[in-house]
Amino acid sequence: MNEKHPGPLVVEGKLTDAERMKLESNYLRGTIAEDLNDGLTGGFKGDNFLLIRFHGMYQQDDRDIRAERAEQKLEPRHAMLLRCRLPGGVITTKQWQAIDKFAGENTIYGSIRLTNRQTFQFHGILKKNVKPVHQMLHSVGLDALATANDMNRNVLCTSNPYESQLHAEAYEWAKKISEHLLPRTRAYAEIWLDQEKVATTDEEPILGQTYLPRKFKTTVVIPPQNDIDLHANDMNFVAIAENGKLVGFNLLVGGGLSIEHGNRKTYARTASEFGYLPLEHTLAVAEAVVTTQRDWGNRTDRKNAKTKYTLERVGVETFKAEVERRAGIKFEPIRPYEFTGRSDRIGWVKGIDDKWHLTLFIENGRILDYPGRPLKTGLLEIAKIHKGDFRITANQNLIIAGVPESEKAKIEKIAKESGLMNAVTPQRENSMACVSFPTCPLAMAEAERFLPSFIDNIDNLMAKHGVSDEHIVMRVTGCPNGCGRAMLAEVGLVGKAPGRYNLHLGGNRIGTRIPRMYKENITEPEILALLDELIGRWAKEREAGEGFGDFTVRAGIIRPVLDPARDLWD
C-alpha cells in the first residue's frame, strides 16, 4: 500500500492457531513441566512443541537417520537446540568454560555453534538434559529466555574493538533494550530454575498476553561497520557520536529477509529511516515500536505478520506517527551516517584503550575439535588464562577482547597451535551459511556442510581470474527463511531442494540492497559455471574499487531491487 491509500491498522479475521496457543498457555507455561517427566517420548507434545521456543529451544531430530528410524518403527531421534540470550555477543571466560563443559558432556554433537545473531547454540540436547542446561546457564548468569518465537530476540551490537569507548556505550544500550523488552512472566524461572510460584497474577505490560504477532529483531549499529546487517532486522538504532561519545541514535524500522518460495506476497525488505532521537528517549522509542507492532501486526496470517508487512500495509508515515505519539517525542531529521563494510578484521587490532583484540575466523561458527585443529580445546585453554572477555560477532567469528600487551604472545601461541589462526582467503572470510542439515527441520538443501567445499571452488575461480586478493560477500541459506542472510549478499544461494538452490545476485558489499533471483532451482555445477563467467567479466570490466554486486547491476546483468515490496519478484 502507498501512503495515500493505507490499509487497515488492524487486520480482522480468524486468528492463527498460534494465537490460540499463546492465549491458552498461561503466560508460556503450558504443560511443559509435566511433559518433562514423560519418559515415553524424547520430545515435547502438542502446544509444548511450540511453547518451548519462547524458552529459547527448538525441538529437532537428526534428519540423516530419520528414514532409517522410521523403518525400524522408532520415533525420530528428538533433541533440542538451545539458543542463549547474549546481547551484543559478550561472554565472560568463566561462562565460556561452563558452556564448553556442557557441550562436551551433554550434547549429541559435542559442539558450540556461534550464530550470526551474536550468540551460541547447543545442538542435540536430549530431553533429560533440558532442565540441567537452563540451570547451568543460570549458575553463570546466563539464560535462554526469548531467543526464539514471538518476542524481541537476541539484541545485536556492532563488534568494534577499536572504538572501545563507543563500543562500551553502545553495548550498554543493547543490554538495556534487551532487558526492557524481555517478557515478565515467571514461567521460565518456575519451570527451569525451580523457583516458587508467586501468588501474583502475571502481566505483560509491553508484550501483552499473546506476545508479538511474530519474531522481532533489534540491533545497535556503530557506523561505518554494518557487521550486524541492520536491514535484516525489525528495529535498528544507528549510533551517532560526537567526539567519540555516543549522543543519540538514528532509528530504522522494518527490515527482514524471510520469504516463501513462489509466494509473491512475501518479500525481503530493507529498513525505513524514521529519524534521530537523543539517548534519553531510547527505551521509550523501543517500547513504542514494539507495542505498535504488537497492536497492528497481522495475527491472522503468520506469513504476513512481521513488522515489514505492517509498515507496507499502514504506511511508513502512519507507523512513524504512532511511534512518536506513544513515545511522546518528535523524531529529528536523520543525522548523516555511512557504511563502508561489514566484515570482521581478522587478526590483532589495537584499541584506543591500548588493549589488543584478536578476531579469530571460525568457519560457519562451528567450534569443535577437528583432526589437527582442536579449536574447542584451544579456546578453552585461552579462556582459562585470559582476563578479558570473548565477543561473538554477527559474522559467526570470535574476538578475544581486552588482551594486555604482556599476554599477547601467550594467547597467540595457543591460538596458532590449535588451528585458530590458520590463514584463509579473503573470500572464505566473507562467506557464511546457516546450520541447515542434519538438525534443522526446515532445511531444503545443505548449507553449513556445503559451504567449505563450495568456497574451495570459488577460491579456484577467483585465482583463475586474478582476483584472489578480493572478495565477494557470499552466503548460503538452506531454506527461504533466510537465517544465513543470503538475501543481503552479493551472491546469495537459497536452498530449494537437495542439491538445488536459487541463485540471487545484485546485493552490495555493505548490505543495503536486496539481491534479485538470477536463476532458479540450479545445481552446484550450474552455479559455478555461471559464476566463472561473471567473475571473469568482473575481473576485466570493473571500475576501480567496484564490488561484484555493484558491477552486476551496472553491467546490466541483473536489475537492482529498488522497492522490494513491489518489484522483488518481477
UniProtKB/Swiss-Prot annotation:
Kindly list the residue ranges recorded as spanning the membrane: none
EC number per UniProt: 1.8.1.2
Q: Which GO terms describe its cellular component?
A: sulfite reductase complex (NADPH)
Q: How is the cofactor bound?
A: Binds 1 siroheme per subunit. Binds 1 [4Fe-4S] cluster per subunit.
Annotated GO biological processes are: cysteine biosynthetic process; hydrogen sulfide biosynthetic process; sulfate assimilation
**UniProt binding sites for siroheme:** C483
For this UniProt entry, the molecular function terms from Gene Ontology, in alphabetical order, are: 4 iron, 4 sulfur cluster binding; heme binding; metal ion binding; NADP binding; sulfite reductase (ferredoxin) activity; sulfite reductase (NADPH) activity
Cite the entry's keywords alphabetically. 4Fe-4S, Amino-acid biosynthesis, Cysteine biosynthesis, Heme, Iron, Iron-sulfur, Metal-binding, NADP, Oxidoreductase
Q: Where does [4Fe-4S] cluster bind?
A: C434, C440, C479, C483
SUPFAM superfamilies, per this entry?
Nitrite and sulphite reductase 4Fe-4S domain-like, Nitrite/Sulfite reductase N-terminal domain-like
Query: Can the keyword Cytoplasm be found in this entry's annotation?
Result: no
Q: Which reaction does it catalyse?
A: hydrogen sulfide + 3 NADP(+) + 3 H2O = sulfite + 3 NADPH + 4 H(+)
A matching Pfam family: NIR_SIR
Named in its record, the pathway it takes part in is: Sulfur metabolism; hydrogen sulfide biosynthesis; hydrogen sulfide from sulfite (NADPH route): step 1/1
Cofactor section: siroheme; [4Fe-4S] cluster
Q: Note the subunit structure.
A: Alpha(8)-beta(8). The alpha component is a flavoprotein, the beta component is a hemoprotein.
Function, as annotated, reads:
Component of the sulfite reductase complex that catalyzes the 6-electron reduction of sulfite to sulfide. This is one of several activities required for the biosynthesis of L-cysteine from sulfate.
Q: Which family does it belong to?
A: Belongs to the nitrite and sulfite reductase 4Fe-4S domain family.
- What name appears for this protein in its UniProt entry? Sulfite reductase [NADPH] hemoprotein beta-component
Which species is listed as the source? Escherichia coli O7:K1 (strain IAI39 / ExPEC)
Gene responsible for this protein = cysI
